[in-house]
Amino acid sequence: MNLHGNRLSVLLCWRFGLLGLVGAALVVGSTGCSNSSTLTPVTSNDAGTAELDAVPETDSGTETDSRLELKSEASPARELPKYSYGIVEQLARSSSRQTVAEFKSTLASLNKIHDHPLYTMIYEGDYEIQPEKLFRASQAASTPDFGCSLFYQYQEGQSVFGRNFDWELHPAMVLFTHPPGRFASVSMVDTAYLGFSLDDLEAFDSKTQQRACVEATQIPLDGMNEHGLTIGVAVVPATQIKDDPEVPNAHALHMVRLILDTAKNVAEAKSIFERYDVVFTGAPHVHFLLGDAMGQSMVVEIGNGDTSYLLNDATVAGAKNWQSATNFHLRDEENPVGQCPRFARLKETLSATDPVDLKPMELLSKVGNATTQWSAVYYPGQGQVDVVMGRDYEHPLKFDLNEKANFGQPRLGTEK
């Protein structure tokens, strides 16, 4: 479906059930995930994905023998694009804990909605967060010289989170998830991490190759959950990271997933970060910007053998009502190294503009460049996100996390 050039609102319909923090079933660390013995192995193909025909044809949502597993020898047939960080070939088993019906429904929801390739997918069912060893760099120690821009602003109960993803052109995905017992969220995914490329969009239509899409849960680059907690990452220069053998490791992108799935606010997110040593195996070093619906924000930086938490509470009298991050470390607030014009522009605008008057997408357009693949504006208090692909700021796509009717069925309409 070609929707490029039309001014559209994409309202993703969502459901909510009983919610709670993830329990012991979600395990992240150097030892991997638990309960693998309960899963039934299935055959694998040369794309490194599960052979659906080998799985019992049942729609049961509770039978463990209907869930999916990948064999450890699985590997993709196609070469990964430059600067991608493929995970499919590294999986000892799929992160999916779906029934066959959920697996089929998830792939059936995959839909291309923009010619600057953007897909939507609604993941049904459960998944595990996999350990950091799953990532492998296709271009070891090599990072493109691109930049990203993130900001958060809050005033009088209204918060906004903006993000430019500046990188090589790859197919992108808006992913909706709601794993049992955890929080619903919307997130943005660069599908190059799954081995997809601009030169092979037909792979999304291949029943064999598209199955890698179920691993998209593992690699969000920015997103927001139902409580309004929002998070994004930006590349920074590599520095020494913590290496405590007594502390479990978690990959940076898995931390994004953990936060979206299990934290309601910045304080809870900080407590999750404190439980892990964040690693960047097979991917560039990044720092994190987080903001919630209550005026709290935080920049998290890993480097110099430690983790820094730069906290801001916009509800405190005299405190600034914004934070931002680009592509240099902020932990030395008096003299941050490597400041860029984008950060200066964000600082100037956010310091001088009342949130009521702020035009967040316009600000992102001013700090974007030719490599800006998507611009996303999240509204934590409303559960909404606007996405612009390829700097097409005249035609934003609007997604709504709060619509509850007709779960799993996107509906298109005029912009609100």
Describe these PLM feature segments:
Residues C33-E73:
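Ser/Thr-rich, Pro/Gly/Ala-heavy low-complexity intrinsically disordered linkers and tails
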